[in-house]
Amino acid sequence: MNALEHFEKLLEFETDCWDVHEDLRSGKPDYVILDVRSPEAYGAGHVPGAINLPHGRIVEGNLAAFPASVAFVVYCSGPHCNGADKAAVRLARLNRKVKKMLGGMAGWKWDGFELELEVGSHETGNLDGSKTGIPA
C-alpha cells in the first residue's frame, strides 16, 4: 500500500471534530452522530444533535428507526477511550456505514465547540432520527 492509498483509506473511515462542526454549522450533515459514552457522560455535555447509544447497546433492534443507507459518525471521550472503535466495529458488523470522529469529546472541547446539555438518548426514547434531519 502506498501513502495515497493509506490516507484515502483513513479518510474513508475517519472524520474530525472540525469537519463535523462545519457540517452541523452548514446544516448539511448526511449522517447520524452517535455519542457512545454513558448516559451520565452524555448528559454532562455532548455534540449538538448527537444521540446517546452506548457502544454495548448497538444492536440492530436499536437502529431499526434508521434506514440501512444511513451513515453514522461515532465518538467517545477522546483518544484515551476505545468506545468509538468498539461502536464502529459493532456498526460495521451490522453492515452499517460508519466513521469515527477523531478526538472525541476531548477534541470537541479542545477546539472550543459548543456543547448541548439536553438529554436525548435511546433510553429516553429519542432514537427515532428526529434530531438528525435524516428520514427514518
Feature-to-residue mapping (PLM):
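Catalytic cysteine-centered active loop of the rhodanese-like fold, especially the PTP/DSP P-loop
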Residues: 63-109
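A conditional alpha-helix N-cap/helix-loop micro-motif detector
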Residues: 13, 52-55
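Short loop/helix-cap segments at secondary-structure boundaries that form the rim of catalytic
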Residues: 42-48, 108
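Glycine-rich, charge-decorated loop segments at or immediately adjacent to ligand/cofactor-binding or catalytic sites
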Residues: 109-115
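Flexible, polar/low-complexity N-terminal or interdomain linker segments that lie immediately upstream
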Residues: 1-41, 117-136
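Short, hinge-like loop/turn segments at secondary-structure boundaries
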Residues: 51, 69, 115-119
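Alpha-helical scaffolding within the catalytic cores
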Residues: 57-62
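Short active-site oxyanion
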Residues: 27-33, 48-49, 71, 96-97
